[in-house]
Regions:
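Catalytic-core regions of core metabolic enzymes
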Residues: 188-989
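Long, contiguous binding/interaction regions
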Residues: 1-211, 215, 239
Length: 989
């Protein structure tokens, strides 16, 4: 059977141009090439466009398309004539096309590099960012086809279209002639166009998540009539949480006369609901999900939470079901959390959404929580609840997402939402896998600059249900790159909660200086030792003795906080001894009172056998309880009644200064084909009015809670992470610059690379080619002359000049001086011949050893510099000392390319063996500025030429003055595709 691709004029159908996109309002659409089979769709699309929009497109009244027009707009060669369409529900909502032109605007073919571009967007979908997204995609297509410049003619009154072009960030020229505005712009991405694209990406993806977390109406599909079952549980959780919007129970098995389930309107299908549905929670078996998705899409549901299992986690068949699920949902513009998801929670008083399997609503607070695993998610909610104390506060949860297989909505999307969410101050994430490390690193850097981001990443293999890009980088390298991006990387969920509590409750420390005080000398010394081990600078502990009273603690803490030589205070406490024993509440109040004047310094408590103190510290100063909050037994143990005790108005905390709106899904949205339209001017299912939001502002005066830890190492580890993060925040304000070097020959290097790649798609360069390429970037490599015979070695030494080194370069001996395959400081021919004989007698004939002779470099510290382009993480620069010991210990530091001058300085000092470069134990310090310059030059080479996919300089001898590169290898290959520089797309399925 002939396909549309077979019937195109010249080229096969370019399926790689197909993409799913997120629109400005958070909905989705599909972009694809227009084919000859789209004639009817095109005509139907055009009939729904207003006369005004048609006039703007054709500069004259144009009520309908002629047969000739339809043929022209559906027949493309995908080179000189290209058309793309944005579709929702399989129908066109917008089109864009380009036609290659030559001088005078006449039709042309390659190598002409200019094209005329034109758009048409249905009026119902204008304002959703469709044209802006299509411009990104048609520009990428044009660049692929050798077009470097677009021209567009627009009527002056068509301000929307003019704005699409001018806001895109491309370098452009504008002229006015014969009543028409002519815009011309280069398609080469600029810093501004990339910034515009990423800002649009952030807004669109954040809104798509916001629509899932702030629905005005929720339908739970799969609610049984009898108690029990997943659907019934979720419905009960939504009711118990006090969801402020409309709830619906859906089950195709309901009898016709059933009107309600637990007081919630009941329907056999989503299509039967009289009114819009913003979010559907799908709790039916996997085999029933496709029909449910169709019903939801036809009704205009905006998003799905799919709890059903039986997808990619179950094997190849399930993986295909998962792909089809995502494709099916995106056809209707819906986003999915799941499948195999645990659900979502939003504690905002204007929403109060618990669309999850969590039995009770978490305490409202300022922590955003993401977990791919439902089991880990419930454990994290439980731990935050147990250690949060009180009933509301900074250490409660703002929003919670458990994405399951994260087939669609991922941690990247939720990061986009939390980045500018005013109700979230700290982000905690448990990641079993990272689908797009390059994007995650970029988003993490931006998020961490605004609020702390703490991550636990599983070090093992990704679960079966997760789509993960292949990476050659070790887990430790990925962790190092995340730290470079400002991520607080911890190893366990205990450390995740420990760090999260400190960051949510206390200010960031200004430095590493720590005061320690308490009523136990032993516990104080233990804390002191842990501070030293974590790289902090503790002062000698102040021992208040075991008879210390709350007043003694208050006085000592106040004095420590007032001391300018202190950046943070750790209070240690054990049970008091003797008749003067005091209650935990009194001590907690004394500490809290002293900490209120902390002047921006964090306070932590380490306690032994004082569980009551930890609870009292968390509960100190607490205010009115929030209705429908988590009962103490919510996650195991005895359950208590959920009824809140009435409080007087005086006990109620002030409302948060910027409460999140209850729901705003209607802004800018359009009705999908087949959807139920809302009444004119009506909002989508407004939630019940809310008079106050009990979630307190992050820094409310007098309400700061002090985190308590049952072990010194846990408290100090959390503090150390806060210190490093605070330092990163300060340094991120000025990340440094990428230096320019006058002796770099970028053009010459590009020409050489192009010539070399003509031999094949991937090759490792020979010695001369490597030296030639590196030389164009000011990186000289010491000559190493092959010496297959003693006479050849003597001749090479005469050419190079004594003293020389003789090295075996066989793979099993290369860079292994510890095995004895290197002889140094050979001052004359006699020494050289003796060394040659020793090597061949010890290791075998020259044919196996591959000996080379090299002139001796100045003595110094042997190091290794590497750069590699990883398909998932991007370009990475690595540095470490040479030798087996460093390799075994994994003592290597990493930075993302391009590297700035500050990055290079930090990179050199990041390895544990860095003291060897700076005069350790009386040795001579080496030339680290020259080493940093070498790192910067390698970074420039790889950044300027993505065809350079791997560089290794080993060894690099760093001497007292200068560096010597004694060995180098370079690998070239066609550059891997970079989706971070292309048009905005959702992950392909």
């Amino acid at each position: 059977m002939q396909t549309p691709a077979d019937r195109q004029d010249r080229h096969v159908y370019p399926s790689h141009w197909e993409a799913d996109i997120v629109l400005r309002d958070g909905g989705t659409a599909r972009v694809r090439p227009i084919t000859v089979d789209d004639a009817d769709r095109l005509v139907s699309f055009y009939e729904q466009v207003s006369d005004e929009s048609k006039y703007y497109r054709f500069f004259a009244p144009y009520p309908r398309l002629s047969a000739k027009d339809v043929h022209r707009f559906t027949h493309h060669d995908f080179v000189d004539r290209v058309g793309l369409a944005a579709t929702i529900g399989g129908e066109f909502v917008a089109t864009v096309r380009y036609d290659r032109i030559g001088p005078g605007g006449m039709p042309a073919s390659a190598p002409a590099d200019e094209a005329e571009v034109a758009f048409l967007v249905q009026d119902a979908h204008q304002g959703r960012g469709v044209a802006s997204a299509l411009l990104e995609h048609i520009a990428a297509v044009a660049r692929e086809r050798g077009i470097r410049r677009f021209a567009a003619e627009v009527l002056p009154a068509n301000n929307k279209m003019i704005k699409v072009f001018t806001d895109a960030g491309y370098t452009q020229q504008r002229s006015f002639e014969d009543g028409v505005v002519r815009l011309e712009f280069d398609l080469e991405p600029t810093d501004r166009s990339v910034a515009v694209q990423r800002a649009r990406e952030q807004r669109a993806e954040a809104r798509s998540v916001r629509r899932l977390l702030t629905p005005g109406s929720v339908a739970v599909i799969g609610v049984g009539r009898a108690p029990g079952g997943v659907g019934r549980s979720v419905l009960g959780n939504l009711r118990d949480a006090g969801f402020t919007g409309r709830l619906y129970a859906v089950n195709q098995a309901y009898p016709d006369d059933l009107k309600e389930v637990d007081g919630v309107p009941a329907h056999r299908s989503v299509r039967d609901i009289d009114g819009p549905v913003d979010l559907a929670v799908v709790a039916v078996p996997a085999e029933q999900v496709p029909g449910v998705v169709t019903d939801c899409g036809e009704h205009g549901v905006q998003g799905l939470v799919v709890l059903a299992a039986g997808y990619a986690e179950s094997g190849p068949d399930g993986r295909e079901r998962q792909r089809e699920l995502v494709r099916h949902a995106r056809t209707y513009g819906m986003r999915i959390i799941g499948p195999n998801a645990f659900g979502v929670i939003n504690t905002a008083a204007g929403v109060r959404l618990n669309a999850s399997l969590a039995p009770e609503m978490p305490r409202p607070g300022r922590i955003g929580l993401f977990a791919q695993s439902g089991a880990i998610g419930i454990a994290l909610l439980s731990r935050l609840h147990r250690r949060g104390g009180g009933v509301t506060g900074t250490t409660g949860v703002s929003t919670f997402v458990s994405s399951g297989n994260r087939a669609d909505v991922s941690g990247n999307d939720v990061l986009q939402y939390w980045y500018d969410d005013t109700e979230t101050d700290v982000v905690l994430m448990y990641l079993e896998s990272i689908g797009n490390p390059r994007k995650f690193t970029r988003l993490s850097r931006r998020t961490a600059a605004a609020k702390p981001l703490v991550v636990v990443q599983s070090a093992g293999s990704a679960p079966q249900g997760h789509a993960v890009r292949a990476t050659r980088l070790p887990h430790a390298t990925v962790s190092a790159l995340l730290r470079q991006a400002g991520v607080i990387r911890v190893d366990t969920i205990t450390e995740l909660v420990d760090a999260g509590l400190l960051l949510a409750r206390q200010p960031l420390p200004a430095g590493p200086r720590v005061a320690i005080l308490g009523n136990s000398e032993s516990l104080g010394l233990l804390t002191y030792d842990r501070c030293l081990a974590e790289g902090l600078r503790p002062a000698p502990p102040l021992d208040l003795t075991t008879t210390a009273t709350p007043a003694d603690f208050h006085r000592a803490l106040s004095q420590a906080l007032a001391d300018d030589t202190c950046d943070a205070v750790v209070v240690t406490a054990i049970p008091t001894i003797g008749e003067g024993a005091v209650g935990d509440g009194e001590l907690a109040e004394a500490l809290r009172s002293a900490a209120e004047g902390a002047h921006g310094k964090p306070v932590l408590v380490v306690h032994v056998e004082l569980g009551g103190l930890a609870e009292a510290l968390s509960a100190a100063g607490r205010t009115a309880p929030q209705p429908h909050v988590m009962a103490p037994g919510a996650f195991g143990g005895p359950r208590r009644p959920r009824t809140a005790t009435p409080q007087s108005a005086a006990d109620t905390p002030p409302a948060a200064p910027t409460a999140r709106p209850a729901a705003s899904p209607s802004a800018g949205s359009a009705v999908r084909p087949g959807a139920v339209p809302a009444a004119p001017g009506a909002a989508r299912t407004p939630p019940a009015p809310v008079t106050e939001d009990v979630r307190p502002p992050a820094a409310q005066s007098g309400s700061r809670l002090i985190p308590a830890y049952p072990a010194a190492e846990r408290a100090v580890r959390a503090l150390a992470e806060a210190v490093k993060y605070a330092q990163w925040r300060r340094e991120s304000v000025d990340p440094g610059k990428v230096p320019e070097y006058d002796d770099i020959d970028e053009k010459g290097a590009a020409e050489l690379i192009g010539t070399l790649l003509e031999r094949g798609d991937g090759l490792t360069l020979g010695t001369e080619e490597t030296c030639a390429l590196l030389g164009r970037y000011g990186i000289p490599v010491h000559r190493a002359l092959p010496s297959p015979t003693p006479e050849a070695a003597v001749s090479a030494a005469a050419d190079l000049g004594y003293p020389v080194a003789l090295k075996a370069t066989a793979p099993h001996l290369r860079h292994r001086a510890d095995l004895g395959g290197v002889r140094l400081d050979l001052a004359d021919e006699g020494q050289l011949r003796r060394a040659y004989t020793e090597l061949t007698e010890l290791f075998g004939p020259p044919g196996e050893l591959r000996p080379v002779v090299q002139r001796m470099a100045p003595r110094g510290v042997d190091t290794v510099v590497r750069a590699v382009i990883d398909p998932a993480a991007g370009a990475v620069l690595s540095f470490g000392l040479a030798g087996a010991a460093s390799q075994l210990l994994g003592d290597t530091a990493h930075r993302l390319i391009p590297v700035t001058d500050r990055d290079a300085t930090s990179l050199v000092r990041s390895i544990r063996t860095a003291p060897l470069l700076f005069g350790w134990r009386g040795s001579t310090p080496v030339d680290t500025p020259a080493l940093e310059e070498l790192l910067l030059r390698v970074s420039r080479l790889v950044d300027d030429h993505p065809e350079v996919v791997a560089v290794t300089l080993e060894p690099v001898v760093v001497a007292r003055h200068g560096v010597s590169v004694l060995g180098a290898t370079v690998r070239l290959a066609p550059p891997p595709a970079r989706d971070d520089l292309g048009p905005r797309t959702l992950p392909a399925y």
